[in-house]
């Protein structure tokens, strides 16, 4: 994933694009003859012909600040954890295993197994943390449906996945303003 991100960043820079980190978009205004004027935190003002909204769970908030109608994204927490491989077992070529009811999954990951309860719990956009109950549910499902025994997770985390009501992807130019890309 890191290599992919770096490749995208190289391509962005080669095409004259910039990545600005640790900035808050306060507001944005679009003028047909001049493109976007973005007001960022710390008094920074940026001009842009095209605005790409890659804010994930915060994408609707960004759209509103740009005068664009939100699409109704619902951020959902997903919990994951890693755990030890059974002693003497090479799992490097194991496939991803998903429960028939999609109540869990696990797969090889960097010499360990990565598991999840495959949850999608609706939350507000935020820096989410893993819930102990979600980890316990994931461990329970994996142990219940396999012969794996998980003594304890090595590491756990949570992230946000965002969905619209129909479950489809949101990608492409906005219907009302083609200079705003979802």
Please identify what each model-predicted range represents:
Residues 69-72, 85-179:
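Active-site lid/adjacent beta-loop-alpha segment flanking the redox-cofactor pocket in flavoenzymes
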Residues 35-37, 45, 80, 103, ...:
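Structural motif
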Residues 44-95:
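Central helical "cap/lid" subdomain
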């Amino acid at each position: 994933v890191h290599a992919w991100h770096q490749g995208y960043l190289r391509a962005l820079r080669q095409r004259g694009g910039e990545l600005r980190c640790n900035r808050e978009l306060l507001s944005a205004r679009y003028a047909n003859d001049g493109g976007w004027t973005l007001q960022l935190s710390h008094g920074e003002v940026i001009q842009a012909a095209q605005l790409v909204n890659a804010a994930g769970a915060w994408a609707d908030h960004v759209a509103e600040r740009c005068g664009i109608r939100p699409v109704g994204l619902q951020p959902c927490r997903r919990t994951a954890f890693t755990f030890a491989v059974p002693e003497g077992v090479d799992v490097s070529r194991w496939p991803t295993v998903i429960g028939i009811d999609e109540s869990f999954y696990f797969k090889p990951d960097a010499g360990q197994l990565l598991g999840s309860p495959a949850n999608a719990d609706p939350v507000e956009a935020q820096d989410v943390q893993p819930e102990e109950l979600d980890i316990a549910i994931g461990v329970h499902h994996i142990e219940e449906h396999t012969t794996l025994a998980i003594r304890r997770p090595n590491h756990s985390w949570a992230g946000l996945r965002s969905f619209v009501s129909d479950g489809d992807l949101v990608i492409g130019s906005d219907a009302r303003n083609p200079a705003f890309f979802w």
